[in-house]
Amino acid sequence: MQYQTESWGSYKMSSLGFGGLGMVADTGLLRIESLASESAVVIFSVSTCCMCHAVKGLFRGMGVSPAVHELDLHPYGGDIQRALIRLLGCSGSSSPGSLPVVFIGGKLVGAMDRVMASHINGSLVPLLKDAGALWL
Amino acid sequence: MANHRMSEATNHNHNHHLPYSLIHGLNNNHPSSGFINQDGSSSFDFGELEEAIVLQGVKYRNEEAKPPLLGGGGGATTLEMFPSWPIRTHQTLPTESSKSGGESSDSGSANFSGKAESQQPESPMSSKHHLMLQPHHNNMANSSSTSGLPSTSRTLAPPKPSEDKRKATTSGKQLDAKTLRRLAQNREAARKSRLRKKAYVQQLESSRIKLSQLEQELQRARSQGLFMGGCGPPGPNITSGAAIFDMEYGRWLEDDNRHMSEIRTGLQAHLSDNDLRLIVDGYIAHFDEIFRLKAVAAKADVFHLIIGTWMSPAERCFIWMAGFRPSDLIKILVSQMDLLTEQQLMGIYSLQHSSQQAEEALSQGLEQLQQSLIDTLAASPVIDGMQQMAVALGKISNLEGFIRQADNLRQQTVHQLRRILTVRQAARCFLVIGEYYGRLRALSSLWLSRPRETLMSDETSCQTTTDLQIVQSSRNHFSNF
């Protein structure tokens, strides 16, 4: 079971274009990978975080119901958060390590600033449609 | 020698004790001014402080006038008739001339009487002085009489050589109690005037310090007023980060005006698309600059930004998360932009829609932040108040994140507009937006500078207007003239 998940995870990693990250995949990263692919829109959040509340509100306002993982309530939350910070640091986000982090269709979109920017430049809606989160 | 010193010391003590009792007596019936009026001319009608200066001046003038005085006293001024001067001239006669130079004006008299005391045993010397003084005083008396002084001053002069009790006894002359009393009074008057001078100088000094403090305050207020650019009253406790931002924003506004006129002339001159593109790109870079400045300011003073103290009042009316609402830009544009293709219109409406959704999301987040701040502060502290405050502070620090995201949203909206529109349309669009905000700022200063009567008559506005704003409005009102 463990072996199966791992091989599946690393496969998905390389297919997602994470490249080198997949090679040094640790448990945190693997957990992110598996959680992110479970739903069309996945948000890694902290239950008390107001910006996380904002991003959840954004998707709900667009008619999307995202899968939300509150890391402060999650048994492996610490691991996942550390892995997310590393992931965002690599993706060149302006605010590395800041939650929320959004995955659409199993692909990393980024933190709040990336989500907002892609919504304004009109790339978010097609992404959501492709992932099957939006029909209209 | 020891005796001399003893007598000196006791004399000093005596002199130090004497003034205070005498000063009170003198202050009550103003004998010193009486002396001046009596001995001098009627022109010595000065106030208390000026009197001190006059006396001081007299002393200096006396020292200056010494050589001619000794040489014959032809140039003696009427003021030298002041009864205390004979003692001084006595002291500064040729044998003592070297000492007289070092004798300062302030402690002169106190030292002086001590020295006179020490000279006392040299009776031949002092008697010689008396002899020398005698004609000199007569001279002075004569000169004073010629200058139209009252005759009383002349009668005063002759007994002066016998001013010292001990001198009088050594020289075997009878001492005149009345003269002694007058001399003592003179000495005390001189001392009193010195004290007054000291007080006056101290008063001047403190006034000077006060003045320089006021000047500094004025300078500060003026520079802050400059930073604010008339955008509002400078806060009494403005932080340095906020002040720097206000200054930078003032500069940015100047740049903004420059960019606006550049775009305007560019559009009017029918520049080529490439030239116009340079101007539009320059404007977008300038627009990005304000977000960089705000990011720095939000780190320094998040509250200054979020309540928009740096904006003009009318701009503040539309404030949303430390700036304009991105969707407002499109509201401004829609009525003003023409010749848009169907695709462009679709793009703009879609932009308006997504910016509204993003605004709504951020507003929800900020609402949640406020709610959690309320919950944190309203709850009675579980462990101690400091921990509660630490939690609240942590929440406030999240405000910075919201300002950053809102600015990101504004910035992205402007960039998206640029992508949707052609260069010429974009130039027109930014001109419309720039002119709109220019008018909004002009409206603010008009509102602030509306006549005071309106403020006074309109009771409701009076209630909502703070004193500062009234002051501000009157200031602007005057500056307009």
From Swiss-Prot, chain A:
Signal peptide: none annotated. Disulfide bonds join 49-52. It is found in: Cytoplasm; Nucleus. The keyword Disulfide bond applies. Gene3D superfamilies: Glutaredoxin. Pfam families: Glutaredoxin (PF00462). Keywords: Cytoplasm, Disulfide bond, Electron transport, Nucleus, Redox-active center, Transport. GO terms for biological process: negative regulation of DNA-templated transcription; negative regulation of transcription by RNA polymerase II; petal development; petal formation; stamen morphogenesis. InterPro entries: GlrX-like_pln_2, Glutaredoxin, Thioredoxin-like_sf. Disruption phenotype: Plants show a reduced number of petal primordia and abnormalities during further petal development. Defection in sporogenous cell formation in adaxial anther lobes when associated with the disruption of GRXC8/ROXY2 leading to fertility defects. A motif (Responsive for interaction with TGA factors) lies at residues 133-136. SUPFAM superfamilies: Thioredoxin-like. Highly expressed in inflorescences, roots, and siliques. Expressed at lower levels in mature flowers. Changing residue 110 to A: Affects glutathione binding. One of its GO terms (cellular component) is nucleus. Its main location: cytoplasm. Residues 29-135 form the Glutaredoxin domain. Belongs to the glutaredoxin family. CC-type subfamily. Has a glutathione-disulfide oxidoreductase activity in the presence of NADPH and glutathione reductase. Reduces low molecular weight disulfides and proteins. Involved in flower development as a regulator of petal primorida initiation and further petal morphogenesis. May mediate post-translational modifications of target proteins required for normal petal organ initiation and morphogenesis. ROXY1/TGA protein interactions can occur in vivo and support their biological relevance in petal development. May be involved in the regulation of the floral regulator class C gene AG (AGAMOUS). Interacts with TGA2, TGA3, TGA7 and PAN. Interacts with TGA9 and TGA10 in the nucleus. NCBIfam families: GlrX-like_plant. This is Glutaredoxin-C7. It comes from Arabidopsis thaliana. The lineage of its organism: Eukaryota, Viridiplantae, Streptophyta, Embryophyta, Tracheophyta.
Swiss-Prot record, chain B:
Residues 110-126 have a biased composition (Polar residues). Mostly expressed in stems, inflorescence apex and flowers, and, to a lower extent, in seedlings, leaves and siliques. One of its GO terms (biological process) is response to molecule of bacterial origin. Residues 204-218 are annotated as: Leucine-zipper. A motif (Nuclear localization signal) lies at residues 165-172. It is found in: Nucleus. GO terms for cellular component: nucleus. Induction: Induced by flg22 in leaves. Residues 97-109, 143-155 have a biased composition (Low complexity). InterPro entries: bZIP, bZIP_sf, TGA_domain. Belongs to the bZIP family. This is Transcription factor TGA9. The gene is TGA9.
